[in-house]
């Protein structure tokens, strides 16, 4: 896992600005598994009209790419087969997770253990043949404007936009 971040904050009495960028890059302990996330944020707050009006706006962008994140439950989860793999068996036997079936003219999954009523599959097959990729793009924008009419009365308005796009691919 690698995490990197940088931020910048600057300002005066009437104007403050903040910007940051961060990245998380990791490869899981499950083979062929990875997660990458990048965050970018900027925010500015300023006052004017003798400090009676305040304008605050910000923007964030998040890009996330992941591959073969472990499914929950028993279906398509490599951990189920790994946990229930008989101790008397040898892992090197199943690391060659596919065999060529001449009659069908395709490679088929090699999993001599069976499914034990739990839809178990060879963990290597799941990680190298049942590929899942996910790409998420998200951006958020916000702005606020307030005006101090009297010392005890302020009028304010805010707007926020949150938009995301998710592109998910699963290959069997």
Predicted regions and their residues:
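Surface-exposed loop/interface segments of Gram-negative outer-membrane beta-barrel transport/assembly proteins
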Residues: 1, 29-33, 39, 43-138, ...
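Short strand-turn segments of transmembrane beta-barrel domains in outer membranes
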Residues: 1-7, 17-33
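Outer-membrane beta-barrel channels and translocator barrels
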Residues: 12-13, 49-51, 148-150
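Outer-membrane beta-barrel architecture
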Residues: 7-9, 20, 43-45, 142-144, ...
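Non-cytosolic beta-sheet module surface loops
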Residues: 9-10, 22, 160-161
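An active-site-proximal structural segment forming one wall of the substrate-binding cleft
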Residues: 153
């Amino acid at each position: 896992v690698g995490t990197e971040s940088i931020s910048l904050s600057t300002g005066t009495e009437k104007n403050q600005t903040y910007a940051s960028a961060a990245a998380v890059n990791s490869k899981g302990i499950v083979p062929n598994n990875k997660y990458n996330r990048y965050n970018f944020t900027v925010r500015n707050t300023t006052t004017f009209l003798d400090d009676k009006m305040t304008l605050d706006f910000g923007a964030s962008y998040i890009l996330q790419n992941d591959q073969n994140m472990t499914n929950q439950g028993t279906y398509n989860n490599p951990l189920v087969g790994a946990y229930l793999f008989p101790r008397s068996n040898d892992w090197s036997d199943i690391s060659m997770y596919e065999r060529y079936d001449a009659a069908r003219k395709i490679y088929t999954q090699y999993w001599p253990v069976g499914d034990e009523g739990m839809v178990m599959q060879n963990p290597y097959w799941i990680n190298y043949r049942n590929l899942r990729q996910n790409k998420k793009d998200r951006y958020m924008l916000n702005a606020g404007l307030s005006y101090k009419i009297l010392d005890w009365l302020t009028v304010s308005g805010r707007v926020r936009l949150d938009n995301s796009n998710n592109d998910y691919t699963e290959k069997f």
